[in-house]
Amino acid sequence: FQKNDINYGWVMVVVVFTLSGLAFGSMASISVFLKPVSLEFDWSRGQTSFAYTVASFSSAAFGVFWGYVADKYGTKWFGLAGALSMGFILFSLSSLDSIYKFYLLYFLFGAFGSALLFSPLYANVGFWFRENPGLALGIAASGGAVGQAFVPHISGILIEASGWRDAYIYLALIYLAISLPIALLIQESPWREGARQDAETEERDFPLSEKAVVAWISFAVIFCCVCTVSYTHLTLPTTTIV
C-alpha cells in the first residue's frame, strides 16, 4: 500500500482496531486487578474501582484537547505517543504503593493513553474513506470490544500465574511489542492534509447546525458509556466464594 493509495485506509483500520483494542482492554482489565490489589492494600472495592472513574474522566477531558490538536497538526505521532504512554504506565503500576499513585497512574492512562488513541484516530480513519466510511469506522471501533473481551482474560491468566505486580509488567511488555510497530504505520489521509492547509467553508443541506449535531451525539454517547461502567465490578462475584 502507498500513502496516497485509498487502500491505505484499510491499513489504518487495522492499526486503529489494534490500538483501540489495547486501550479499551486495559481499561476493562481493572475489573480483574480489582480483587488482588484491594486485598493487598486493604482498600475497599469503591476506593479501588474509583481508578476507573478517574481514567474515564481524564480520557473524556483530554479527548477534547487531543481532538483540537489533531485538527491543527494531524495524528501521525498520536499512536506512538499513546503506545509509549500505555507501556510506561502499566509498568509503573507494578510498583504501586499507595492509592493516590493508583489514581494518578490511571489518570495518566486516560489522558495520554486512551484519549490519544480513541476519537483522534477514529477521525483519521474516517478521512481516508470517501465511500463507506461508516463500515470502516465500525470495523475500527469494534477493536475496542475485542480488546475488552481478551485483555481482561489474559490479565487474569497472568495474575494467577505470577501475581498482579508481574502481570502488569508482562502486560506492559506485550503492549509495547504490539503497539509500537503498528503505531509507526499511522499516516494522514491526503484529503485531510489538503483540507487542513486549504481551509474552506463546506456547504451542507442539513436541518441542524454542526454544534447541535455534536451536542446531541455527545449526549447519547454519555449515556452509552454510563451503561458500561458496571462491568468494573462484574469479575468479583465470579471469583469470590461466598
Q: Which residues fall in each region the model found?
A:
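Pair of pore-lining "gating" transmembrane helices in MFS-fold secondary transporters
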Residues: G9-S26, K211-C227
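Residue-level signature of mid-helix packing/kink "hotspots" within the transmembrane helices
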Residues: A28, S56-V64, A149
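Helix-to-loop junctions at the C-terminal end of transmembrane segments
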Residues: G63-G74
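C-terminal ends and interior cores of transmembrane alpha-helices
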Residues: S85-D97
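Hydrophobic core of transmembrane alpha-helices in multi-pass small-molecule transporters
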Residues: K101-A115, I222
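Intracellular juxtamembrane helix-capping segments at the cytosolic ends
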Residues: L116-F129
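Helix-loop-helix hairpin linking two adjacent transmembrane segments in secondary transporters
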Residues: G144-Q187
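Conserved small/polar residues in nucleotide/adenosyl-binding loops
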Residues: T232-T238
